[in-house]
Amino acid sequence: MGNGNSREAKESRRSRLRHKLQKFRIHRRHLRSSRNSAGMVIQRTVSAEDFSGIALLTLIGAEMKFKDKWLACVSFGEQTFRTEISDTTQKPIWNSEKKLLLEKNGPSLARVSVFETNRVARNKIIGYCELDIFDFVVQEPESTCKSFNLLDPTSSNVVGSIFLSCAIEDPVETERRFAKRILSIVDYNEDGQLSFSEFSDLIKAFGNLVAANKKEELFKAADLNGDGVVTIDELAALLALQQEQEPIINNCPVCGEALQVSDKLNAMIHMTLCFDEGTGNQVMTGGFLTDRQASYGWMFKLSEWTHLSTYDVGLNTGSSASYIVVIDRKSKRLVEELIDSKIVLSMRAIYQSKIGLRLMDQGAKEILQRLSEKQGKKMSSVESAQKIPRFLEFFKDQINMAEVKYPLQHFKTFNEFFIRELKPGARPIACMNRNDVAVCAADCRLMAFQSVEDSTRFWIKGKKFSIRGLLGKNVNPNAFLDGSLVIFRLAPQDYHRFHVPVSGVIEQFVDVSGSLYTVNPIAVNSKYCNVFTENKRTVAIISTAEFGKVAFVAIGATMVGSINFVRKEGEHVKKGDELGYFSFGGSTVICVFEKDAIGIDNDLLVNSGRSLETLVSVGMQLGVSTRTFARSTLI
């Protein structure tokens, strides 16, 4: 009797699964009817934000204004790919392609950069364009090839055109192609369908013991017409349904890699790309983080050959390499921050060694102080204006002069240019009518932590760092102990005016004397140096209704001439209002919130947890008051 009940239960499960598969196949047929012969959706009702799938981006060629050897790079999310170098020509042809993963709430903005490669020292970016891959999802392309203007990174002048195509493979087609490739592994007689024996071998390859014990049940459920074999469509429906309900694939049947069962989309994409035979076009070389790194050429061929990861993100990167990689919040792609290699070697020698810091204690601090003051005066001289064009050239693709309030000839000294104002509206303020939403205080590289403990674990390595030490002796630190901490690091190329992150009243300004160490991550990540608690700084306390008190700490750094505030004690300020500016040099602002006063945006916390700085602009959302939310739930 027990065996009978077992058989009935098994038949019942099989019947339910078969019924679900039939409904699933009807839904798939409906979706397939909306595709053309190329597998593209003709009428897309899905929104870009909800779409997940694969985009095949092909860089066909370009038309430039002079002859050279050219290469192109595509940056998308945390990956960058590059083409081969063309022959010397004005019209390079690459025909290079790469499959990009589109995820819900993932990156969608791709940046294509074109470099000239005739220089021995470093390839030079000539032009770039940005395109939203999701535009190809919601719009039917008018032709297989589109032309985009290439813009000069500094002037936004058109310097050429690039020709590319982007084909979006909808999820149903991806499932079917995936099933076809999966089926081919064990289709021993190559008849395009699976017998029970072949199906059993496939289930074994998936590495799921539970599924292997139910292979007969799964086979009968998949074989909807009862002809004793499973077709491509039947297998696709089974795999799609099971991956949604009870995943049966634990290991990739191609490479054997263990798959994350919780990440169904990436598991399918991983296996799809493992099976990929390509289209015959040249596949772009990957393994890079930024377009600048990808453009270096021969170094990366060597690094790939030796299977070494030359570039990476995180804490060790910032403290030990001649570059800093940050993630752009807007485009969700990685970008490289330029630092002169000689400066990097000097900073490492000083800040990453006990000997260097001992020199600091024996008078080098005073030398840095005098050097910074001297350099500040020099940058305020009329002669210093001659340095502006060279500065713009060095940071060619990182300063947008179209945003600047005045034309270049307006600036009579380098410092006037350094503290340049922006045009009204250049930095929109998030949720302007909501005082419970805090915003970013500067154009900067940002690190955010819900607690001081997190900040010292992931980023600040100075042994003596504390909130009490940061605020100085003349500010009562009790309200801020165990509070949230946000670090806004401004690089030389950034807009150097800082703004109010919250609306409230400025209670007081307190000057704290100190040294002028660099605020570069090379120093911040040093266990021998206490940058934030030893540098010259000014503390502003802002009293708010939504966040309680907020400490706004403006910290000077090497080469910073002065910290200037444009507001006064007792003045009411709105978030986004200009609060002050730094003269020439790198500099940092730190905001400290009271404990449990703010819920910092998750993407900022996730990046900071990876020791990865986020590139943000003034006015971007920083977080939301938790106290306002708590009050609203009590009412």
Swiss-Prot record:
Residues involved in Ca(2+) 2 binding: D223, N225, D227, E234
Subcellular location: Vacuole membrane
Cofactor(s), names only, from the UniProt record: pyruvate
Membrane topology: Peripheral membrane protein
Keyword Protease (UniProt): no
Molecular-function annotations in GO: calcium ion binding; phosphatidylserine decarboxylase activity
Matching PROSITE patterns: C2 (PS50004), EF_HAND_1 (PS00018), EF_HAND_2 (PS50222)
Cofactor note as given: Binds 1 pyruvoyl group covalently per subunit.
Keyword list, A-Z: Calcium, Decarboxylase, Lipid biosynthesis, Lipid metabolism, Lyase, Membrane, Metal-binding, Phospholipid biosynthesis, Phospholipid metabolism, Pyruvate, Repeat, Vacuole, Zymogen
NCBIfam families tied to this protein: PS_decarb
Primary role: Catalyzes the formation of phosphatidylethanolamine (PtdEtn) from phosphatidylserine (PtdSer). Plays a central role in phospholipid metabolism and in the interorganelle trafficking of phosphatidylserine. Contributes only to a minor proportion of PtdEtn production.
HAMAP family reported in the protein's UniProt record: PS_decarb_PSD_B_type2
The protein's name: Phosphatidylserine decarboxylase proenzyme 2
